[in-house]
Amino acid sequence: TSGDLNAVLAGIRAAVAAGFERVKLNCVLMRGVNEQELWPLVLFAAEHGLPLRLIELMPITTTDVLTEKNFMPVHEAMELLRQKDELIPQPDWRLGFGPAKYYQLKHTGARVGFIGAMTNLHFCETCNKMRLTADGKIRPCLGDHGEMDLREALRHAPDDAAVRELLATALQRKPLEHQFRGAYQPCRPMTAIGG
């Protein structure tokens, strides 16, 4: 985190203590930046009974952070964890509605999901998400710029049917695959897209 780690950890503990059912930890993999933190994150996740998701760096931010130097594919993260514990595939686990492939670590009991958006050619086949941006737009795909204005529809729709129609149209516009490998140029930071 670029913020106060103690505040982040306190927030996670508070969410668990408050009874939130779907607390998940996300970590964007960055070679040379956080690979030494993966095992402590696994231990923290195991201690608190939380799933940890390790996510490949994607070209989402408006700055150029995705480089060959700092990109770490999920298979490298898996190898780092295999040096500490055995990874047992859990193909039937669906913790949430995302494309993570989950494993349980034999000795720690940790649940770790790997999200290989850049290296898994079949990544998009299991994605059933749409994003709601901070300014009320529906984005059918994280890796595509197409958006529809849900906020305006909610303000001006005569009934729920118009909103349902907009959502159905947005879902139909969901592309078969993201555009990250092509000439994709980010236009919004992740904080504005919604994650």
Stretch-by-stretch model annotation:
Residues L43-E47, L57-G195:
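Auxiliary Fe-S-binding modules of radical SAM enzymes
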Residues T1-I55:
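Radical SAM/AdoMet-radical enzyme domain recognition
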